[in-house]
Amino acid sequence: MALLQQILYKVNIISVTGPTDIEVNDLQIDSRKVSNGACFIAERGTLSDGHHFIEAAISNGAVAVICEKLPGVLSDRILYIVVENSAIAAGIMAHNFYGQVSEKITLVGVTGTNGKTTIATLLFKLFSGLGYKCGLISTVQNQIDKKIVASTHTTPDAITLNHLLADMHASGCSHVFMEVSSHALHQHRVEGLHFAGGIFSNITHDHLDYHKTFDEYIKAKKSLFDSLPSSSFALSNADDKRGSVMLQNTKAKKYFYSLKTLTDFKGKIIEDSLLGLELVINDVEVHFRMIGTFNAYNLL
């Protein structure tokens, strides 16, 4: 149970209708999953509008409703809070409800068209091998140390994501490596999270069925780095034409990697064969049981 007033910390509220001194025991964006004592957040999605299911959520036991527009008929026993953007509110509220857990771990987000899964998984395996208890959130699977958790999206919805991070923290994870898709950024699924760092791999003309224009796609990816605080790091691919654009407005400490130019992390392929990759990274020769130039970038 938590006081709703505390969960609403930093949410941009437009109006409040109904009793305010209430406690909630759950947050939901799916009216079918609402139970007694829950707060229902009506999000406007790409396929459906949560505002159409407010009445169903109340019937299932919701005691509070977060929405962008009040329904036509109000219930005297329900608290209605109108916000500017329900999706943004969901991210912030989930962050607060689960104890602002992303601030208690080292959370690193990886974005880009290609390489997200590989980079996040490599970091997970590297830090696990160094003795850290880690979490992984990826398209292939989510993992809490050695325990595998089913994955349904590249980046889960805000409530599921914060719940998962809370489980990781409760299990003793100190580091979490997460794929952050452009869809998730555009839909504010990572809103409210504190990232210790962000990594950009590359960008190509994919997902334009969703983002419509390449500029909108770039803008979505870039928003991860725009939101990073000065205490975080931002690492980008200098060989991608948009690599520097991604970091142009970030407050984070900037780093670049490259196979072509002298940067913070400079790599050179010595050999690429069926036996693996032989690389020189910042004058240190290393061998990896992976092949291909694309994996050389992922390893950097």
Which residues make up each language-model segment?
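Phosphate-binding loop of NTP-binding sites
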Residues: 8, 90-238, 242-252, 282
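Short, well-ordered beta-strand core segments
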Residues: 40, 65, 80, 198-199, ...
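Adenine nucleotide phosphate-binding catalytic loops in nucleotide-utilizing enzymes
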Residues: 211-218, 222, 248, 252-300
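Active-site regions of enzymes building and remodeling cell-envelope glycoconjugates
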Residues: 76-84, 149-152, 251-258
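Fold-independent oxyanion-binding glycine-rich loops
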Residues: 27-30, 43-44, 69, 83-86, ...
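Positions that flank functional sites
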Residues: 72-73, 142, 183, 262
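N-terminal leader/targeting and accessory segments in enzymes
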Residues: 1-92, 241, 266-271, 287, ...
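Short glycine/serine/threonine-biased micro-segments
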Residues: 16, 35, 43, 48, ...
